[in-house]
Amino acid sequence: MFAAGNVSGFLSSLARGGLQFVIIIWLQGIWLPRHGVPFEATPLWSGIYTTPLDLGFILLGPIAGAMSDRYGARVFASGGMLIAAVGFVLLALLPVDFDRLPFLAILALIGVGMGLFASPNTTSVMNAAPAHERGAASGIRATFQNSATVLSIAVFFGILTTGLAARLPLIMTRGLESLGISAPIAHQAASTPPISVLFAAFLGYNPLQTLIPQSATSTLHTHAKELIFGTQFFPELIAPAVQDGLHLAFYVAAALSVLAACASLFRGKRYISEE
């Protein structure tokens, strides 16, 4: 029970940490700028839009904890991770330019799943340890959880940039050429490393202002210049490439959640160490 709880907790934290990281990039770097939110306001609105995730967790956590004390943790923890997996798949099916209500509802669903898992899993891990060893058990549980959260940033950032790199050069080249930028200049701008593009979008910076020389736009119409160097064109330009990385990341998170549910099933029925 102790091992199963820690393994499932590790996998859950690995999926959840990556989710928060990827969604913030999605909102702050792509969706909010495309909908006219000023770059300086995107961090605030990213936090507001992810509130349903926390609300679902907060509301279901205490209820699941109380119920698991009576009926055992296995059903609640495993069921919660399966619900979270469904939520991740639904996120992967959303278009990059999603509607608000489905997005918020899916985040709430994932929060509910995580809330159903967290408290019962913690209780199960602690109950499996003798009373005189519960301090060490708590430390081991926290180490698994914190290590997974830190590791998830590297894992999901790598997944996101891998998906981005697959289509970014072609998409950027075609997008710039469609506005009248010459092929050599467009190709040079499109060769920017995917990590740089991702961070530029995340920080609210349009790198086209430095990647494309002013001389290359001297013959363009004024509207085309304003579009290229404005705040909305760059997020729209890279959105299809970012979408590939997002979908891959969410499917990986769903797989991790299913594995966490499977690991949770091995914890056995309700058990409290009497030592």
Regions found by a protein language model. Give the residues of each.
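Transmembrane core module of solute transporters
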Residues: 1-136, 152
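Small-residue-rich alpha-helical segments with characteristic i,i+4
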Residues: 8-10, 19, 103-195, 199, ...
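Short helix-coil transition/hinge motifs at the ends and kinks of transmembrane helices
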Residues: 29-44, 170-185, 228-239
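Residue-level signal for alpha-helical transmembrane segments in multi-pass membrane proteins
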Residues: 63, 90-94, 155, 160, ...
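Transmembrane-helix exit segments and adjacent C-terminal regions of multi-pass membrane proteins
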Residues: 69-74, 81, 188-275
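Transmembrane helices with small-residue packing motifs
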Residues: 91-98, 164-172, 268-272
